[in-house]
């Protein structure tokens, strides 16, 4: 993506500031703006002292001491910004020329490369059952079969069970045989009820 910005509507500085670089007044005025005189490029102590002594104490501000070492700060600022009569400020100190006119037209290009790889595979399984069990009415409740239970007194003399499915008719109505047949009948009925329910 390329973005071009036209800054003609922004307040521009007249190119007359850049025309007289050699004079000390111009370099002093341009010290806080875009311009910077070439005489301050050499980062030696003599040039730094000359630069600081040429400014009044009222004009010396935080921008003149960007680091704890004033000489290092001066060297950084003087090498970072260089101008000539027809050039604007170049961040890489290249000699890009700009026409001398009262209206500046700068073009800024932004290069934006964005690569996004999204893997959005969503495996979802939703099972909705809309079958609702019907509430059993009281009549259905009454129609349920009541299976015989083997009570605690099932081995009494009154509890007589038919032994028609027995292998032989021996040992008729003994208490163990009664319990066995009652249990076997109960298991048959439970199995039949399960088959019907399924």
UniProtKB/Swiss-Prot annotation:
Region (Disordered): 16-37, 53-72, 85-104
Keyword Glycoprotein: yes
Cofactor(s) required for function per UniProt: Mg(2+)
Modification Phosphoserine occurs at: 67, 154, 156, 164, 166
Function: Plays an essential role in the viral genome replication. Participates, together with NSP2, in the formation of viral factories (viroplasms), which are large inclusions in the host cytoplasm where replication intermediates are assembled and viral RNA replication takes place. Orchestrates the recruitment of viroplasmic proteins such as capsid proteins to these factories. Participates in the selective exclusion of host proteins from stress granules (SG) and P bodies (PB). Also participates in the sequestration of these remodeled organelles in viral factories.
Organism: Rotavirus A (strain RVA/Monkey/United States/RRV/1975/G3P5B[3]) (RV-A)
GO process terms (BP): viral genome replication
UniProt name for this protein: Non-structural protein 5
Family assignment from sequence similarity: Belongs to the rotavirus NSP5 family.
Complex formation: Homodimer. Interacts with VP1. Interacts with VP2. Interacts with NSP2; this interaction leads to up-regulation of NSP5 hyperphosphorylation and formation of virus factories. Interacts with NSP6. Interacts with host DCP1A, DCP1B, DDX6, EDC4, EIF2S1, AGO2 and CAPRIN1; these interactions are probably part of the sequestration of some host SGs and PBs proteins in viral factories.
Keyword Magnesium assigned: yes
Main subcellular localisation: host cell
Annotated residues for binding of Mg(2+): 92
Domain of life where this protein originates: Viruses
Pfam families on file: Rota_NS26 (PF01525)
GO cellular component, one term: host cell cytoplasm
GO molecular function annotation: ATP hydrolysis activity; magnesium ion binding; nucleotide binding; RNA binding
Record-linked InterPro entries: Rotavirus_A/C_NSP5 (IPR002512)
Subcellular compartments: Host cytoplasm
Record's keyword terms, sorted: Glycoprotein, Host cytoplasm, Host-virus interaction, Magnesium, Metal-binding, Nucleotide-binding, Phosphoprotein, RNA-binding
Record field: compositional bias (Low complexity): 16-30
Compositional bias annotation for Polar residues: 91-104
């Amino acid at each position: 993506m390329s973005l071009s910005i036209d800054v003609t509507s922004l307040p521009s500085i007249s190119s007359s500031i850049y025309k007289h670089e050699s004079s000390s007044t111009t370099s002093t005025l341009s010290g806080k703006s875009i311009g910077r005189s070439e005489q301050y490029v050499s980062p030696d102590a003599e040039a730094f002292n000359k630069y600081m002594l040429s400014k009044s104490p009222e004009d010396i501000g935080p921008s003149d001491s960007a680091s704890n070492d004033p000489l290092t700060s001066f060297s950084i600022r003087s090498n970072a910004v260089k101008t000539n009569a027809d050039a604007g400020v170049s961040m890489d100190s290249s000699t890009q020329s700009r026409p001398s006119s009262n209206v500046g037209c700068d073009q800024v290009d932004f290069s934006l490369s964005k690569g996004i790889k999204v893997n959005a595979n969503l495996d979802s399984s939703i099972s909705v059952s809309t079958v609702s069990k019907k509430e059993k009415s009281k009549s259905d409740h009454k129609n349920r079969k009541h299976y015989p239970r083997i009570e605690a007194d099932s081995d009494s003399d009154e509890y007589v069970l038919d032994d028609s499915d027995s292998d032989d008719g021996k040992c008729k109505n003994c208490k163990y045989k009664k319990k066995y047949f009652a249990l076997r009948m109960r298991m048959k009925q439970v199995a039949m009820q399960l088959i019907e329910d399924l």
